Amino acid sequence: GSYEFAMKSRGKKGGAILGTIPLLGSLGIAIGYAIIVGWVLRSAFGALTGSLMSTEPEQFFTEMSSTNFSSVPWHTLVILLTAAVLIFGVSGGIEKINKVMMPAFFILFIIIAIRVAFLPNAIEGYKYLLVPQWEYLFNPRTWIMAMGQAFFSLSITGSGMIIYGSYLPRNEDVVHSSCMTAVLDTCAAMLAGFAILPSVFAFGLDPASGPKLLFITLPRVFQQMPFGRLFAFFFFISVLFAGITSLANMLEAVSEAAQTRLKLSRKAAVLLSCGAALAVGLFIERDTLMGTLMDVITIYVVPIGAILGAVMAYWVLGINKMEQELMNGRSKPLSRAFAPLAKYVYIFLAALVVFFSFIIPGGIG
């Protein structure tokens, strides 16, 4: 209802229709994301039973991702866990667990990063990650793709963060929280790069292979580590909790819209949203189909949702109203640069991403 609220503040209609675009983006990402989190759950179970450690990682990944309906139980269980989080309000419990799991996740990645540093040919991974190719800085596509990645990584989809923002206490310093989110997200991405890319080159894999790198390279590292089975289990469990939390964010936006627009109860709205995600996801469990869906959503739908959200906030609702809201919980005034950056620079850059999404072959992904 946030888009509708913004439009009504100007005496206009159509907010509900515009709001469906970012909601479709959230639902589309959730459909693909649930499949990947199902693979994470399967890998955690494999680490627990030992099958992950005794099987070739390529074979293990192929068995759970190469055909339709190849990971139905794990995929379904992930959706059920997410529905439980949303229906029974156990998000507080998940948040408490994540306060332990997220630091553990970082610690495990540091341990993995140290281990892979001693693998043969790991130096090529560090070169790939750290040696700059300056010519790409002058290629507009580099910047467009980087911003498109930021939309996805920081959930700037025009829906999920708006819904979660409505649940924050009034005295929350949103600016500080946003900055910390961006910093920690970047740190996590860099740490993952130091853990994964050297092992990619050590094992002769393609660094552009996508999500499968998580399920092939790291199990190979765990297989060569002392107590690797234990490390593998805790690693994938940490990723599982992070995945469930992110999935709940995406489906919360869809559920809230269903609850408001269709006049459903909270439980019915969650079941409808989760059921829709599962119903579609079951038919695209093969990694190539799932990848195609995620490409379409992240290349075309998410950037449009991002610019719609910004236009609604900074132009329709108004920059003055946004500044008033952002000052709640802050002791320092906002920078004078905030208004021009938000109204002009950010929206211009977001519009460029949308434009190039359609004219660059393959989009921005």
PLM ranges: what are they?
Residues 2-24, 34-92, 121-144, 208-215, ...:
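Inter-helical loop and helix-membrane interface segments of multi-pass membrane transporters/permeases
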Residues 4, 37-66, 167-171, 176, ...:
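Helix-loop-helix connectors at the membrane interface of multi-pass transporters/channels
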Residues 21-32, 77-84, 97, 144-155, ...:
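Hydrophobic alpha-helical transmembrane segments of multi-pass membrane proteins
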Residues 37, 241-250, 270-280, 298-325, ...:
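Hydrophobic alpha-helical segments of multi-pass membrane transport proteins
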Residues 68-73, 184-190, 229-233, 241-244, ...:
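Loop-to-transmembrane helix boundary motifs in multi-pass membrane proteins
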Residues 75-93, 155-170, 241-254, 311-317, ...:
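Transmembrane alpha-helical segments in integral membrane proteins
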Residues 95, 102-244:
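Membrane-embedded translocation segments of transport machinery
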Residues 284-313, 333-365:
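A generic transmembrane alpha-helix motif of multi-pass inner-membrane proteins
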